[in-house]
């Protein structure tokens, strides 16, 4: 915990959308009268037909939540059409390529035309309302066009991060039964090509229900081509009309499926719907980032993750913002890249991850100080808790002590930000996520299911539904209930721990379930374990997180080999490469320890608490080990940890 406190500057209190008095008044109304509050706020969207009921359902029983029942609207209309009269010539999307010499801008009018054309392309291929499409694209403008085109005609998109492996892509295509896959010949990241079409071909080869593959020519490289199945994006767009009326969608119609890691190994298809999600992202984008006309807003997240969905595309465009989209990485061609983009485009609001901040901080101040950054007025962080040291560097060096930092907490499942400082309303505490957003009722519970009042540390739960939340796990509502509503009855269990201080501010302490937060991206330990165990040399594997100075958490794997295989550095490297191929680079173990056996209870359950402590080198007190079937295994692991440290 940091004892530092940064009061709200007087200029911010006067100019921000939300000051302290407004926050208290709006928050109180949102909790005491949610129907009245959200019904009033929904007026910021354009509706084809008004809703009959604002809110239905609770966190009890079968948990069927509905917002704005009977209302009809269209996401692309709210993000594009309604801005054409007043903002048609304003830049909607500023795209910065991997190569600093390459960039593009699309006005609202141009983006609207492109979206309508691609919506007509999809209709010409037989796609209709409710069909699913898998998008496997790099961070290029066509990704934004494709997702908005889906919303225009009621097609449900499932975007898969371009860094995922063919196997991970296949699993996601198969789960949602996507009829069409949209990909590129290659991606570019840090000057290196990514073989996206090759990966997509491998994935689609085992998905016979996929009818068409649409390919964007990003690099112009030679790629395999399946006649009758594969179609060229540009060729299709040239033949399509730029006139496509928006489909009138029910507020509770599915908008997108986004897969996130679960503790059981199989990724969960988080399903978000239309009206509540769009309202929540638009409102929170304006309020939390204090977005005003003329701001240039940049969220650095890849659209393959929820942050990119909500705060690169949907929230900003619903508000008529200019949003920056970046294809590359912070260190290419050098460590000043982020700050040069800020200067090049006049970025005023920057939203990035603690992992990136820590990596940039490690390079020292010089790459930052050689740039100007005078346009910046607000900074944000997302994906994981930020340590006070990184917070202070971000504030002092990047923002030059003039830019408030909004340290936001939320999840794929929540749709938008749930806990955050408001820059014009709250003093900032480095490392604290501060207060709940409107309509959000957080609480802290102990392991016995008791609510903790006042100060305390425990499991973070949300006690009432909010409009942006997921509605189910696609195709598996029971898993939705088991994952979020079985640990504690009648509340949403976040899977995160938290502490509430004497001021009522929240501090997120990290995951409490079998999920690792690597660079702000959630990975299920079971998913990595399954990949390791699929290797012919591995008998068993257990994976835990451990503190990592750059990523926040790293991946620590305990591997038991089959009796006919011997540990070696070559095998260790082979296993890391194997996981990269099976899941993606994000899941590659940082550390592999050879383990003769794993600590298991007599019922066969792995005691992960012990594995976490050993991985973190916190071995002074391993706790009660009397329930282990073979206590001697712990000594072997401790010796192995020590030996590995000296390798």
Swiss-Prot record:
Coiled coil location: none
Cellular component aspect of the GO annotation: cytosol
Maturation and modification: Acetylated. Deacetylation by the SIR2-homolog deacetylase activates the enzyme.
Family: Belongs to the ATP-dependent AMP-binding enzyme family.
GO MF terms, alphabetically ordered: acetate-CoA ligase activity; AMP binding; ATP binding; metal ion binding
Enzyme Commission number(s) from the entry: 6.2.1.1
Keyword ATP-binding on entry: yes
Keywords, sorted A to Z: Acetylation, ATP-binding, Ligase, Magnesium, Metal-binding, Nucleotide-binding
Requisite cofactors: Mg(2+)
Catalysed conversion reaction: acetate + ATP + CoA = acetyl-CoA + AMP + diphosphate
Gene field: acsA
Binding site for Mg(2+): 535, 538
UniProt-listed InterPro entries: Ac_CoA_lig, ACAS_N, AMP-bd_C, AMP-bd_C_sf, AMP-binding_CS, AMP-dep_synth/lig_dom, ANL_N_sf
Its biological purpose: Catalyzes the conversion of acetate into acetyl-CoA (AcCoA), an essential intermediate at the junction of anabolic and catabolic pathways. AcsA undergoes a two-step reaction. In the first half reaction, AcsA combines acetate with ATP to form acetyl-adenylate (AcAMP) intermediate. In the second half reaction, it can then transfer the acetyl group from AcAMP to the sulfhydryl group of CoA, forming the product AcCoA.
Annotated source species: Syntrophus aciditrophicus (strain SB)
NCBIfam families: Ac_CoA_lig_AcsA, PRK00174.1
Protein name according to UniProt: Acetyl-coenzyme A synthetase
Record-listed CoA binding positions: 189-192, 307, 331, 519, 580
């Amino acid at each position: 915990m940091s004892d530092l406190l940064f009061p709200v500057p007087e200029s911010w209190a006067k100019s921000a959308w939300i000051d302290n008095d407004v926050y208290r008044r709006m928050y109180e109304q949102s909790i005491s009268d949610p129907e009245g509050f959200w019904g009033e706020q929904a007026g910021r969207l354009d509706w084809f037909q008004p809703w009959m009921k604002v809110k239905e359902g609770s966190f009890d029983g079968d948990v069927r939540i509905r917002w704005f029942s009977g209302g009809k609207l269209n996401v692309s209309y709210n993000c594009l059409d309604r801005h054409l009269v007043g903002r048609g010539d304003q830049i909607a999307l500023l795209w910065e390529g991997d190569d600093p010499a390459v960039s593009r801008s699309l006005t609202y009018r141009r983006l609207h035309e492109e979206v309508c054309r691609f919506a007509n392309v999809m209709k010409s291929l037989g796609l209709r309302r409710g069909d699913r499409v898998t998008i496997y694209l790099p961070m290029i403008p066509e990704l934004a066009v494709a997702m908005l085109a889906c919303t225009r005609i009621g097609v449900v998109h499932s975007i898969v991060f371009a860094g995922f492996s063919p196997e991970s892509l296949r699993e996601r295509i198969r789960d949602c039964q996507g009829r069409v896959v949209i990909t590129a010949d290659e991606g570019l990241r840090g000057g290196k090509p990514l073989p996206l079409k090759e990966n997509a071909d491998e994935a689609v080869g085992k998905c016979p229900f996929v009818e068409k593959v649409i390919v964007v020519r990003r690099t112009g490289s030679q790629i395999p081509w399946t006649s009758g199945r594969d179609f060229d994006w540009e060729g299709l767009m040239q033949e399509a009309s730029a006139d496509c009326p928006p489909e009138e969608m029910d507020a509770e119609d599915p908008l997108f499926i986004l897969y996130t890691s679960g503790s059981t190994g199989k990724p969960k298809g988080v399903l978000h719907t239309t009206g509540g999600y769009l309202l929540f992202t638009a409102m929170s984008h304006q309020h939390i980032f204090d977005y005003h006309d003329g701001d240039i807003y940049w969220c650095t997240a890849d659209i393959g993750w929820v942050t990119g969905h909500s705060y690169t595309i949907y929230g900003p465009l619903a508000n008529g913002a200019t949003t920056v989209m970046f294809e590359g990485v912070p260190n290419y061609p050098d460590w000043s890249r982020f700050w040069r983009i800020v200067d090049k485009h006049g970025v005023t609001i920057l939203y990035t991850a603690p992992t990136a901040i820590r990596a940039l901080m490690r390079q020292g101040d010089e790459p930052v100080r050689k740039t100007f950054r005078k346009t910046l007025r607000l900074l944000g962080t997302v994906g994981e808790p930020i340590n006070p040291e990184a917070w202070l560097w971000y504030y002092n060096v990047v923002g030059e002590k003039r830019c408030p930092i909004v340290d936001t907490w939320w999840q794929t499942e929540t749709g938008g930000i749930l806990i955050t400082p408001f820059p014009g309303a709250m003093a900032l505490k480095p490392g604290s996520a501060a207060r709940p957003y409107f309509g959000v009722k957080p609480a802290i519970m102990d392991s016995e299911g008791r609510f903790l009042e006042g100060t305390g540390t425990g499991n973070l739960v949300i006690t009432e539904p909010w409009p942006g939340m997921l509605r189910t796990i696609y195709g598996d509502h029971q898993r939705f209930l088991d994952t979020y509503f079985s640990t504690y009855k009648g509340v949403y269990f976040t899977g995160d721990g938290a502490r509430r201080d004497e001021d009522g501010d929240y501090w997120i302490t990290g995951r409490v379930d079998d999920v690792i937060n690597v660079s702000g991206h959630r990975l299920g330990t079971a998913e990595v374990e399954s990949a390791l165990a699929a290797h012919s040399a591995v008998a068993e594997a257990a994976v835990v997180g451990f503190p990592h100075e750059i990523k926040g958490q790293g991946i620590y794997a305990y591997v038991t080999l089959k009796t006919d295989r011997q540990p070696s550095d070559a095998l260790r490297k082979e296993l890391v490469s194997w996981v990269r191929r099976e899941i993606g680079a994000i899941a590659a173990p940082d550390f592999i320890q050879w383990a003769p056996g794993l600590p298991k209870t007599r019922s066969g359950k792995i005691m992960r608490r012990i594995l976490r402590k050993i991985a973190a080198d916190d071995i002074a007190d391993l706790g009660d080990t009397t329930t282990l079937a073979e206590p001697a295994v712990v000594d072997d692991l401790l010796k192995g940890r020590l030996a590995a440290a000296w390798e």
